[in-house]
Amino acid sequence: MGEGAGILVLEEMEAAVKRGVPILAEVCGYGLSGDAYHTTSPHPDGIGAMQSMSNALRDARLDISDIDYVNCHATSTPIGDAIEAKAVATLLEKSTKKKNRPIYISSTKGHTGHLLGAAGSVELAFTALAVQTGVLPATLNLQDIDPAVQFEGLVQHIPHNAINYSSGHVIDSTAVPVDKSSGVRFAMKNSFGFGGTNATIILRNPHI
């Protein structure tokens, strides 16, 4: 558990450009679902997670293979983490489009603790910065990856250290220069709640 808050400014693209303010990312898709499977546990087949992501992809007119990075809800529960990773991998397996590299996935709750009601906004800020800089945040303190969440060639976990998306190289320093042409085109943020309430937002890099 942790304490925190996140505030993101949502503005029309034309207004932001006119004001000359830095644009971190563009919201291009949003999806919701409610599987109501259990008070605290998601559906074992990942139905709710897949539906939420599918709805967001449909809204953005994208395929899962277009996504470069997923900031997972992942609360470090054996059941929830495995189901969410499986849902991402299943969507990729069902996709008719080929992806040359795996989707990178990580959870930033290891950095902040679970912020409950503030988790979604803070983690969306992490995701927006990943789009802007091309630096994909690691799952802090991840030592041993559970075989249940490993899907060879489909999803790539980011343990220990952040990585540069374009090069795939590990980044040890937290002081990373901004690269607007980071190579990250689209990133997805999942936020799941008790009772099977699921939300997904897709961000686009407006600079590439």
Locations of the language-model features?
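A general structural signal for well-ordered alpha-helical packing
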Residues: 24, 46, 50-53, 84-89, ...
